[in-house]
């Protein structure tokens, strides 16, 4: 059984107040993301994917899909995400809504 068979998934919807807020977060992530991703990986983050939402009137929305080895791995990553919120999101106005669950079905061409 591979790690992706039964991961814990978090889907986060991010809505920014302005293009400037989105740009600020993107710049901060570009600068700081690699160090955080290494720590998240060690704690059980398997992957993440960012997608801009294009079927809405606003261009200020995106979703992020995070896959973790388990619910425990997700919990172990939470202190790191708290740091990320304080550094990467600092100075930006952003509304974050998260949905979490256990994968019931997964398909990939890989």
Region annotations inferred by a language model:
Residues 13-15, 65-67:
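Short hydrophobic/aromatic beta-strand micro-patches
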């Amino acid at each position: 059984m591979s790690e992706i068979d039964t991961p814990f998934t978090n889907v986060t919807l991010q809505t920014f107040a302005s293009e400037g807020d989105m740009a600020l977060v993107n710049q901060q992530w570009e600068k700081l993301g690699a160090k955080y991703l290494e720590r998240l990986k060690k704690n059980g983050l398997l992957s993440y994917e960012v997608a801009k939402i294009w079927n809405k009137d606003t261009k200020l929305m995106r979703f992020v899909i995070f896959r973790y080895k388990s619910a425990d791995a997700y919990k172990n990553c939470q202190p790191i995400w708290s740091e990320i919120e304080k550094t990467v999101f600092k100075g930006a106005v952003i509304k974050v809504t998260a949905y979490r669950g256990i994968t019931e079905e997964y398909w990939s061409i890989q």
